[in-house]
Design a protein with these regions (language model features):
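Terminal, non-catalytic protein-protein interaction segments that mediate quaternary/complex assembly
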Residues: 1-151
Length: 151
């Protein structure tokens, strides 16, 4: 699916059919947990790549930051290797949960967001490595809470 998306972004960017889908029905019976984040639709507007992430379920405390971050980075990667600018990531979580007793975690005063930096020299999607990315100014809040995760 990734190869097809990359091909279309370069050769058919006006297409409204540039998407991935992780929901393989024939494999669901073998999975302990069905995919939560299951589809991304890419849309090119001018020279800007935008995306919509659909997710069937999400726990706000344990998964939101991971999901938003990893798919935002994916948009940046796809845009860079396709000669586009990264635009917006819209996110639709269909069954969002916030555990009781952890509201204080959500109400804490945040800190300034770090800067995301990606190696501008990478032009082949499959040549990205973990060293291709870094965060500058990351100052996380302490987090000692134990949050239960439902499987």
């Amino acid at each position: 699916q990734v190869d097809r998306v990359l091909y279309d972004l370069r050769h058919n960017p006006a297409s409204r059919r540039i998407m991935t889908n992780l929901y393989n029905f024939q494999d669901l019976h073998e999975m302990a947990l069905y995919p939560c984040a299951y589809s991304v639709t890419f849309n090119v507007s001018g020279r800007t790549l935008n995306a919509i992430l659909n997710q069937r379920s999400q726990d706000m405390l344990t998964a939101n930051n991971w999901n938003v971050t990893q798919y935002a980075v994916l948009v940046h990667m796809m845009a860079q290797v396709s000669g586009l600018r990264a635009g917006e990531l819209d996110f639709a979580a269909h069954a969002l949960s916030i555990l009781r007793g952890f509201r204080t975690v959500l109400e804490r005063q945040g800190r300034p967001a770090p800067a995301f930096v990606m190696d501008p020299e990478v032009t082949d999607f499959y040549r990205f490595t973990r060293d291709s990315f870094r965060l500058e100014g990351y100052d996380p809040l302490p987090f000692d809470e134990k949050i239960p995760v439902a499987i």
